[in-house]
From Swiss-Prot:
Organism: Sus scrofa
Keyword Cytoplasm: yes
Name of the molecule in the record: Selenoprotein S
Phosphoserine sites (modified residues): S140
Function (record text): Involved in the degradation process of misfolded endoplasmic reticulum (ER) luminal proteins. Participates in the transfer of misfolded proteins from the ER to the cytosol, where they are destroyed by the proteasome in a ubiquitin-dependent manner. Probably acts by serving as a linker between DERL1, which mediates the retrotranslocation of misfolded proteins into the cytosol, and the ATPase complex VCP, which mediates the translocation and ubiquitination.
Assembly notes: Interacts with DERL1 and (via VIM motif) with VCP, suggesting that it forms a membrane complex with DERL1 that serves as a receptor for VCP. Also interacts with DERL2, DERL3 and SELENOK. The SELENOK-SELENOS complex interacts with VCP.
GO terms (BP aspect): cell redox homeostasis; cellular response to lipopolysaccharide; cellular response to oxidative stress; endoplasmic reticulum unfolded protein response; ER overload response; negative regulation of acute inflammatory response to antigenic stimulus; negative regulation of endoplasmic reticulum stress-induced intrinsic apoptotic signaling pathway; negative regulation of macrophage apoptotic process
Length: 190
C-alpha cells in the first residue's frame, strides 16, 4: 500500500513538472516568435478565405456547365438570346451611322450651295459677304431677341485726331519727342 501511495504522490509531481516544462517552452516560444505566429495565422486565414471563395465559384461553374451539357435547350436559348442582342445592337449602330451620313450629306450640300452662290455673286460683281447678311435677314424675319442692334458710329466723336501718335511727334502736343541715336555719343572716348 505504501507503494501505491508513493506512485500517487509521484504522479502529480511528474504532471506538474510536465506542465512547468510546457509552460516554460510555450512561453519562451511565444515571447520570441509571438508576433510572427500571429501574422502567419492572419495570413493563413485570409488566404484560406480567398481560396475558398474561388473554389466555390469554380465548383458552381463546373456544376452549371454540367447542367447545361445535360440540357441542350438551355444552351440553345442562351445562344439565341445572345444572337438577338447582337443583332439589335448592330441595327441601332447602323441607324446611328445612317443619321450621321445624312447630316454630313446635308452639310456638304449646304456648303456646295453657298460656294455656288458666292461664285455667282463674285461673277456678277457683288460682294458675297453682303449677300450673306441679306440672306440671314431674310431667313429670320421679324424681331429677334438674340440679334444685336448695330450702333451708329457717326454719332460719336473720335477721342483723338486721326493722325495723332505721341511717339512720332506729329499731331497734337506742344513738344515733339524723337528717339535718341543708337551710336556712341559724340565727344566721348574713342
Amino acid at each position: 500500500m505504501e507503494q501505491d501511495g508513493d506512485q500517487l504522490s509521484a504522479r502529480p509531481a511528474l504532471e506538474t513538472e510536465g506542465l512547468r516544462f510546457l509552460h516554460v517552452t510555450v512561453g519562451s516560444l511565444l515571447a520570441t516568435y509571438g508576433w510572427y505566429i500571429v501574422f502567419c495565422c492572419i495570413l493563413l486565414y485570409v488566404v484560406f478565405q480567398k481560396l475558398s471563395t474561388r473554389l466555390r465559384a469554380l465548383r458552381q461553374r463546373h456544376l452549371d456547365g454540367a447542367a447545361a451539357a445535360l440540357e441542350p435547350d438551355v444552351v440553345v436559348k442562351r445562344q439565341e438570346a445572345l444572337a438577338a442582342a447582337r443583332l439589335k445592337m448592330q441595327e441601332e449602330l447602323n441607324a446611328q451611322v445612317e443619321k450621321h451620313k445624312e447630316k454630313l450629306r446635308q452639310l456638304e450640300e449646304e456648303k456646295r450651295r453657298q460656294k455656288i452662290e458666292r461664285w455667282d455673286s463674285v461673277q456678277e460683281g457683288r460682294s458675297y459677304r453682303g449677300d450673306a447678311r441679306k440672306r440671314q435677314e431674310e431667313d429670320s424675319p421679324g424681331p429677334s431677341t438674340s440679334s444685336v442692334i448695330p450702333k451708329r458710329k457717326s454719332d460719336k466723336k473720335p477721342l483723338r485726331g486721326g493722325g495723332y501718335n505721341p511717339l512720332s511727334g506729329e499731331g497734337g502736343g506742344a513738344c515733339s519727342w524723337r528717339p535718341g541715336r543708337r551710336g556712341p555719343s559724340s565727344g566721348g572716348u574713342g
